[in-house]
Amino acid sequence: MGRRRQGPAQPASELPARNACLLPNGSAWLPGWAEPDGNGSAGPQDEQLEPAHISPAIPVIITAVYSVVFVVGLVGNSLVMFVIIRYTKMKTATNIYIFNLALADALVTTTMPFQSTVYLMNSWPFGDVLCKIVISIDYYNMFTSIFTLTMMSVDRYIAVCHPVKALDFRTPLKAKIINICIWLLSSSVGISAIILGGTKVREDVDIIECSLQFPDDDYSWWDLFMKICVFVFAFVIPVLIIIVCYTLMILRLKSVRLLSGSREKDRNLRRITRLVLVVVAVFIICWTPIHIFILVEALGSTSHSTAALSSYYFCIALGYTNSSLNPILYAFLDENFKRCFRDFCFPIKMRMERQSTSRVRNTVQDPAYMRNVDGVNKPV
């Protein structure tokens, strides 16, 4: 998705050096590079980024961020999926959606080493097949994540505002079916990314780029079309649905003191609703900047200053950072996840604590006995 600038191609002597920060694509968010036409110009649709404006420190900083995202995101999301599979009590409708979100996040974190390498090497060294896979995973994550969060919000809305209907709708089986539908729907974009994604050798600057390969004649049209589709279907419409759901939920929670007839169930309902709200809010905070940046760039209103270009790449990094935040949110905000995480990470300690608690409970429940002179046990 490129931000390109019209103008004549640079002479070979003025082309950026091999160690200039070109940042060729390896992500659905990074721009491709314009291919000069036969007359040596960039063509009417080609606005090319100024590589010289990008500080060489940016790849190093972003690589460090991606390394943390890779470790925390892959381990954390894998642990979330394991906990939901391992413990029967965790197989609730909400947690089935959380599993889907963790799967999408875990997949996208596996692309971090490839993208970090691209930042450091200024070229895509992994070949055409991996290029297609990485870009496809990016688009799958983009759509499955926001679709899953939207369904989680709808699920919460039904649980809070329509508790009777929730008995039929909010089941683990139906949540699994909805997750499958989300992946099938996202495949319309993910498979397109596999088909269109590919590598292109840029001999003029000695790099290999990995990006969506649109027809050269209609590049600007297809580029703009893809950006608008992503902005509308992977951001605007889902966020509007989420806002409507939570607005109705807040009104309902304010108007009713007790939702379920039981204080304990009511506390759990509000706790889970709060967890989903925080996860959704963090997602929107992390992804809004890059979506806005892409939209403004598509309309040709972006600046080419160092600050603007630096902000652009850090907005991309912020979006990927979200994939490592969700497991941390679950650990802090949900007691069931926290308990299961502790049980997995410290099994011996948790087993000893349970045994100690069990002994204390038995001591309290069982009365002490004392043998009298007749040899009969009597409670003390």
UniProtKB/Swiss-Prot annotation:
UniProt keyword annotations, A-Z: Behavior, Cell membrane, Disulfide bond, G-protein coupled receptor, Glycoprotein, Lipoprotein, Membrane, Palmitate, Receptor, Transducer, Transmembrane, Transmembrane helix
Gene Ontology biological process terms in this record: adenylate cyclase-inhibiting opioid receptor signaling pathway; locomotory behavior; neuropeptide signaling pathway; phospholipase C-activating G protein-coupled receptor signaling pathway; regulation of saliva secretion; sensory perception of pain
One MF annotation (Gene Ontology) recorded for this entry: neuropeptide binding
Residue pairs linked by disulfide bridges in the UniProt entry: 131-210
Lipid linkage positions (S-palmitoyl cysteine): 345
CDD domains, per the entry: 7tmA_Kappa_opioid_R
Keyword Acetylation: no
UniProt-annotated location(s): Cell membrane
SUPFAM superfamilies cross-referenced by the UniProt entry: Family A G protein-coupled receptor-like (SSF81321)
One Pfam match: 7tm_1
Keyword RNA-binding part of the UniProt annotation: no
Cytoplasmic side: 86-95, 155-173, 248-274, 334-380
One cellular-component annotation, GO: plasma membrane
Residues that span the membrane, as ranges: 58-85, 96-119, 133-154, 174-196, 223-247, 275-296, 312-333
Glycan-carrying positions: 25, 39
Residues exposed to the Extracellular side: 1-57, 120-132, 197-222, 297-311
Topology relative to the membrane: Multi-pass membrane protein
Assigned protein family: Belongs to the G-protein coupled receptor 1 family.
Its job: G-protein coupled opioid receptor that functions as a receptor for endogenous alpha-neoendorphins and dynorphins, but has low affinity for beta-endorphins. Also functions as a receptor for various synthetic opioids and for the psychoactive diterpene salvinorin A. Ligand binding causes a conformation change that triggers signaling via guanine nucleotide-binding proteins (G proteins) and modulates the activity of down-stream effectors, such as adenylate cyclase. Signaling leads to the inhibition of adenylate cyclase activity.
Subunit structure comment from the entry: Interacts with NHERF1. Interacts with GABARAPL1.
Entry protein name: Kappa-type opioid receptor
Source species taxonomy: Eukaryota, Metazoa, Chordata, Craniata, Vertebrata
